[in-house]
Amino acid sequence: MTDFKMTQDAQGIATLTWDCIGKSMNVMSFEALQQMNALIDQALADEAVKGIILTSGKKDFAAGMDLNVLADLRNASGENPAEGVFNGIQSIHQIFRKIERAGMDAKTNKGGKPIATVLPGTALGIGFELPLATHRIFAADNPKAKIGLPEILVGLFPGAGGTIRLVRKLGAMVAAPFLLEGKTLPPAKAKAAGLIDSVSADPMADARAWVLNATEADLIKPWDQKGYKMPGGTPYHPSGFMTFIGASAMVHGKTKGAYPAAKALLSAVYEGAQVPFEIALKIEARWFTSVLMNP
């Protein structure tokens, strides 16, 4: 089965359409990830491709990760299931980071291709973590759609880079309700909150126009730019310190210490804020593995 298909038009835009066969909602599997990864490699290597758009063949974008995949990953890892889970999460991080860097030179940040996501409807969990790794997110003006990272509500936390990216995008205080409470928003409010970039009646047309006109500067995430400073400050900055103290108190007050996912999430945020982005992803993977192995 093929969950991802790619088409290319005369203007050089490659469109990757996610459409899980036999399912009403897209859910990510490791097989689908490998399919997507191969198509991304193909598009990045093709000189005729000027940019890439990720979208869905269904009314919604995606519901998240197939939780059975995580269980299978743990069970298939033999005597060291934690290592298997960690390596599996790291492989997702590598694919998403490849999308984020999009062929850019590591030193000059030049030579990349614009990659946008078009959300026709709901995007949750890894179905939002994937768009967060792209350069722009365009959503349909669909008030019934929900956008966010609700993993904490099922005893997990965003482990495919969503925790680290959202905190570096919004700052710890602004990101807290989405990460620690699993808050989701319709597209218009998601845009106002800074989760996505555009809401319109025709997001595909907007995405195509952006891809064709994007500059090299448009592709560089803030955390890959020199002099980046986290909104609200890092834990060792005075304002950031108070943010993290407040978040810690909120977690303890709401969970009474009984829910390891919330504590692990906060640890990933705190530790990840103090190190370069690539190392922060490894920290996120380590804490996610800890939660999965010790629910």
What spans do the regions from the language model cover?
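Glycine-rich beta-to-alpha active-site loop
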Residues: I99-V154, P158, F178
